[in-house]
Amino acid sequence: MDLIHFLIDFILHIDVHLAELVAQYGVWVYAILFLILFCETGLVVTPFLPGDSLLFVAGALSALPTNDLNVHLMVLLMVIAAIVGDAVNYTIGRLFGEKLFSNPNSKIFRRSYLDKTHSFYERHGGKTIILARFVPIVRTFAPFVAGMGHMSYRHFAAYNVVGALLWVLLFTYAGYLFGDLPVVQENLKLLIVAIIVLSVLPGVIEIIRHKRAAAKQAK
């Protein structure tokens, strides 16, 4: 429970925690951000990490004159982390996907996560790799499912690069451009919650549609 409470606190107060990391570790924060983003996109056991809000807050902090963070270097490193993470995830799914999800009682490798991602694939096809970047949990499992389904790596790699660029550039530069505005600084926590809700909403809608479609077929 302590870990769960820590994760919830980290996500909801990511602006405070990230500022503390910058103050404590200086330039090493680039490596920390790289590792967090790589884990969220590259490891199916960490779909809960806050990629969207992390990118936005990192961009916002780099806009403040009190920090020495270079937003352009950060964007470059985050794009690389996202691309490499998805590539690793694809490889894991291709080699070990069926074995990892063979246990229906697993608390980590839940079939519901796969079902959620499959519904995205049914609707959007290969473009899921791009669109999933903007949907928490789905973005972690999309490359994994692509690997399980033996999607052509050439096609996957193209979608992977495009998706990583769009995702990282949008959220990081949005934070950089608007993060130092007084109205944003004063309501940053509410904005973080809004980003999380808006990110999760498409996935929730997709699940509802999928369940309704399954119910109609059952009838």
UniProtKB/Swiss-Prot annotation:
Gene disruption phenotype:
Normal growth rate in strain ST258/RH201207. Increases susceptibility of strain ST258/RH201207 to the polymyxin antibiotic, colistin. Results in production of LPS lipid A that lacks aminoarabinose (Ara4N) in strain ST258/RH201207. Significantly reduces virulence of strain MKP220 in a mouse Swiss Webster strain lung infection model. Bacterial burden of strain MKP220 increases in a neutropenic mouse Swiss Webster strain lung infection model, by comparison with untreated mice. Increases sensitivity of strain MKP220 to nitrosative stress.
Q: Where are the transmembrane segments?
A: 25-45, 73-93, 161-181, 188-208
Pfam families named in the record: VTT_dom
Membrane topology according to the record: Multi-pass membrane protein
Q: Mostly located where?
A: membrane
Q: GO cellular-component terms in the record?
A: plasma membrane
Q: Which residues lie on this side of the membrane: Extracellular?
A: 46-72, 182-187
Localization (cell): Cell inner membrane; Membrane
- Show which residues sit on the Cytoplasmic side of the membrane: 1-24, 94-160, 209-219
Question: What are the alphabetically sorted keywords of the record?
Answer: Cell inner membrane, Cell membrane, Membrane, Transmembrane, Transmembrane helix, Virulence
- Effect in UniProt of substituting R133A: Unable to complement deletion mutant
Summarize the protein's role. Could be involved in undecaprenyl phosphate (UndP) transport and recycling. Involved in biosynthesis of LPS lipid A. Plays a role in virulence, probably by allowing bacteria to resist the host immune response. Plays a role in stress response to nitric oxide. Involved in maintenance of membrane potential.
- Which family is this protein grouped under? Belongs to the DedA family.
Q: What is this protein called?
A: DedA family protein
Protein species of origin: Klebsiella pneumoniae subsp. pneumoniae (strain HS11286)
Q: Gene encoding this polypeptide? A: dedA
